[in-house]
């Protein structure tokens, strides 16, 4: 049991998937230990029932107990920032903070691990690696961000692929065997207390131990600056490795055929380049691995396509930054389109996106809260040649777009902003978009 035997009082901060995994873990390993569940907001009756009678502290009461150093150990869920004042106060009182991911590493010190992070591309890249390993006959599991908490993995595997968000790398204490960092753009600044700290928390994955093999992206200037002199590093989008050029994939100077790869866009080819770099390092044949992708299940809400009365609707709800929306637009370049933009305002710059829209204007843009008004105001002096409208919600956005769409057009939900405020997460936003669109045409195809 990695938690100190001297710990008499353990708190679990967060009652979501990772909190539930932590609760099961502590109860099975330390049934005699007092457990308290902390949560920032009130829990529903069903969520309370799932805690099985554990003591629960909510909101200010939880913060007060933390600041007072009431607990010996706190297992923190990823959504809780380690930079919050109550965390700093608790640490000064000797409270030990850990996480489900850290506990898993401590339980599995000899595991072969492939940890994947990046502002964008981590889900697709980790899924590709996992798929290709399994298709090659290797025993591999996939855990982490947005999926199965690592600690719920009860049996050892030959390889464990971990998808890690910046919330999970920020307080990571254990280095993986292989680290993959796909991209680095400004994101999650409020949670991390600034963009530079966000960058450093992401880069931490490869800085814990120089013996970790790093696979990273030569085309990303921030990653180049961070790791140019790092030993034990393999680059993709590099002259000699797997690279993307002119919307095609190459291995060095030679084209690398990828007829079985089901994903569109140069950004997804970059994800494939990262995954192929990893599996080739592990001794697998890249061509055979690419062939195995014929039945790869595309992660949802990432350029997910469906048709409604001759209109191609694309759910790219995962696009929470303008760089991701740019990548989506380039994927469908040349097709008349309407675009749905807007969400939580994190102060991101849309300058490059505006420049692209000037060169390739849409029929119409629907701008959603909360930053839709800011985008509308920023567009006003640019005199761009397309119609735009501020809407109150996604339903109004879809209605406004369908009034202007013609057969053969594209309707793209790629908001360039997080979903919080109107939706629980980007998945809910994507599901709602599809339901609204299908209601326009009797089900789509």
For each of these PLM feature ranges, what is it?
Residues 26, 74, 97, 116, ...:
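Residue-level signal for inorganic ion chemistry
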Residues 2-29, 33-115, 294, 302, ...:
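Short, basic phosphate-binding NTP loop
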